[in-house]
C-alpha cells in the first residue's frame, strides 16, 4: 500500500504540483512548501473519491503564514486575516494544537477570536474559516473558504 509520504508525493504528482518537504517535529504531520497551497488542496478535493488515492492521509490544510505561538502575535495576524471576511460572511475558527500545553484550547479560542470583529459566527456552515494549526512553538494561520480545506477523516 505504501507510506503516507509516498501517498503525499503521488497525490501531488496527480495534480502536477512540485513540493518540498520541510522539517516537522510531529510524527504523521507533514509540512510541505508548495506554490499555491489553496489551489492545490482544491485540486486534491476533486480526487477524494478516487480509489486508493487517500488511504494514509486525511487532512490537507493550506497555511498562509507561520508565526510564533505567542497569543499577542497570533491575535495580530488573525486581525489581518479577518479583513478577508465580509460583514455578511458566516465564519468560524478551527484550532488544532500539538505539543502545546501553555493554554487550554477553549481559553485559546476565546483569546484568538477577540481579534475578529465580524458578527456572523457559524460553526456548522461557515463561508470562511480562520485556520489555526499549532505545532509546538509555531502556529500556522490561514483564512480559507470551505473548499480550500480537505478533511477525509470521515470517509
Each model region followed by its residue ranges:
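SAM-dependent transferase fold signal centered on methyltransferase-like domains
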Residues: 1-155
